[in-house]
């Protein structure tokens, strides 16, 4: 199998990629610093960040496939990244309570051997339940929201805050597996080799 490198420190992305290709990849964290760019819309921004992460990690390798991603939650015209404090998480959850939000992941797959690069985004509609202040406080105090875009983890306790989704569940977690699997197959990485 060709070398595959995940350009992410996210344990969730590592777990998701292993669902597709087993542990046949290495992790190399990008040193690219994400900064908001006012001239870009949210979709352009997450694609730009994922591309810059992939390019940064590619400098450390001679060959292989680099996979990078950037996920945000978008609500009422605002980008919600990862909350840095408990109070920030509380404010985010109060803001998204009872609303439909978008989980948007920019993803780049860079084949260093062929020069092919796919950079695109995947969106998933997420309908949040109306949360009471006690629910928000309890969830925030669990600590789970702190390193999650939009302050909720659909794959964890935050699942009870989500009424429904329309789109790729794994995109909300941080890596759109359906689209990623399709692109990897196109680049010669067989998802079903070990089946």
UniProtKB/Swiss-Prot annotation:
Residue numbers annotated as active site: 70 (proton acceptor)
Enzyme nomenclature, EC number: 3.6.1.9
One annotated Gene Ontology cellular component of this protein: cytoplasm
Annotated compartments: Cytoplasm
Family annotation (Pfam families): Maf (PF02545)
Gene Ontology terms describing biological process: nucleotide metabolic process
Site (Important for substrate specificity): 12, 71, 155
Described purpose of this protein according to its UniProt entry: Nucleoside triphosphate pyrophosphatase that hydrolyzes dTTP and UTP. May have a dual role in cell division arrest and in preventing the incorporation of modified nucleotides into cellular nucleic acids.
NCBIfam families: maf, PRK14365.1
Cited PANTHER family: BIFUNCTIONAL DTTP/UTP PYROPHOSPHATASE/METHYLTRANSFERASE PROTEIN-RELATED (PTHR43213), BIFUNCTIONAL DTTP_UTP PYROPHOSPHATASE_METHYLTRANSFERASE PROTEIN-RELATED (PTHR43213:SF5)
Designated name of the protein: dTTP/UTP pyrophosphatase
Organism: Methanococcoides burtonii (strain DSM 6242 / NBRC 107633 / OCM 468 / ACE-M)
């Amino acid at each position: 199998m060709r070398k595959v490198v995940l350009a992410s420190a996210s344990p969730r992305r590592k777990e998701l990629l292993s669902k597709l290709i087993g542990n046949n990849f290495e992790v190399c964290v990008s040193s690219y610093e994400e900064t908001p760019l006012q001239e870009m819309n949210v979709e352009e921004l997450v694609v730009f960040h994922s591309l810059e992460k992939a390019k940064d990690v590619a400098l450390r390798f001679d060959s292989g496939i680099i996979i990078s991603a950037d996920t945000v939650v978008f609500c009422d015209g605002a980008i919600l990244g990862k909350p840095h404090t408990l109070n920030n998480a509380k404010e985010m959850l109060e803001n998204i309570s009872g609303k439909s939000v978008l989980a948007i992941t920019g993803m780049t797959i860079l084949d260093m051997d062929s020069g092919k690069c796919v950079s695109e985004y995947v969106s998933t509609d997420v309908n949040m339940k109306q949360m009471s202040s006690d629910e928000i406080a309890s969830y925030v105090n669990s600590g789970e929201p702190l390193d999650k875009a939009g302050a909720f983890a659909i794959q964890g306790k935050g699942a009870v805050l989500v009424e429904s989704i329309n789109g790729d569940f794994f995109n909300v977690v941080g890596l759109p597996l359906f689209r990623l699997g399709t692109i990897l197959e196109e680049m010669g990485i067989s998802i079903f080799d070990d089946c």
